């Protein structure tokens, strides 16, 4: 079948557009698993509240209806102001300096409150995973929300990336003092080497609170060194 020059030109243009990060700044999210609700109230039990006020981190293993992946939520108090927490979390280029498992990161595009970021995770046993995320932030007087969803990265093989991941940071003023941070993540890692499924699931759950721990340390080191 003969393909006209006009058709070839259009196909080339369409492919280039789809491979451009700017295209995904306008695209719809690929996942609905961890879409945040700005109005969501975090309900804490008396025990959870006591733990959080004592500086502990509450870990929740949430149901992921109709999906293969897992959803975890860590809740804890951050030091400092909302402005400080927002500045640290939206400084994506610094993630490799403190975020667990983040080994490399490249910011591909920025448009207003949205950024396209390509991340490489360094995992135990020599495994590496890469993915492209769209981060979107929003602010109000009482707090802020930073959400992300996975975007297509056609150059990667399935074994080089995860099937899906999405999530958000919700940080709001806490009546008990400081700022209450909710770190919510859904991940479907895709195929896992035979016999290692339980290992990686256990590792993900046990290390998940480290996200808040490292964020606390980063805020203190930048704004309150020596305290």
Across the structure, where does each feature detected by a protein language model lie?
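Bacterial N-terminal signal peptides that target proteins for export
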Residues: 2-13
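Hydrophobic ligand-binding cavity/cleft-lining segments
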Residues: 27-112
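Beta-strand/loop substructures that line and gate deep hydrophobic ligand-binding cavities in soluble
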Residues: 58, 154-206
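Glycine-rich portal/gate segments that line the openings of hydrophobic small-molecule binding cavities
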Residues: 62-69, 96-97, 106-161, 187-188, ...
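Short, hydrophobic/aromatic-enriched beta-strand segments in well-ordered soluble domains
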Residues: 76, 135, 182-185
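Soluble non-cytosolic domains of exported or imported proteins
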Residues: 76-83, 89, 93, 162, ...
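Hydrophobic pocket/interface hotspot
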Residues: 85-86, 95, 171, 183, ...
């Amino acid at each position: 079948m003969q393909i006209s020059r006009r058709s070839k030109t259009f196909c080339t243009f369409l492919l280039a557009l789809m491979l451009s990060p700017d295209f995904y700044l306008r695209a719809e999210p690929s996942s609905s698993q961890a879409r945040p609700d700005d109005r969501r109230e975090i309900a804490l039990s008396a025990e959870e509240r006591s733990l959080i006020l004592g500086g502990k981190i509450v870990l929740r293993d949430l149901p992921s209806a109709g999906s293969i992946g897992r959803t975890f939520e860590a809740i804890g108090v951050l030091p400092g102001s909302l402005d400080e927490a927002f500045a640290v979390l939206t400084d994506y280029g610094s993630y490799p300096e403190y975020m667990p498992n983040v080994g490399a990161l490249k910011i591909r595009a920025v448009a207003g409150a949205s950024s396209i970021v390509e991340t490489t995770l360094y995992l135990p046993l020599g495994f590496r995973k890469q993915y492209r995320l769209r981060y979107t932030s929003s602010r109000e007087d009482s707090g802020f929300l930073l959400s992300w969803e996975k975007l297509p990265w056609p150059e990667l093989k399935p074994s080089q990336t995860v099937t899906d991941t999405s999530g958000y940071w919700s940080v709001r003023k806490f009546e008990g003092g400081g700022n209450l941070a909710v770190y919510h993540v859904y991940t479907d890692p895709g195929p896992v080497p035979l016999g290692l499924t339980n290992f990686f699931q256990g590792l993900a759950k046990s290390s998940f609170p480290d996200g808040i721990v490292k964020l606390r340390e980063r805020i203190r080191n930048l704004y309150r060194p020596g305290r």
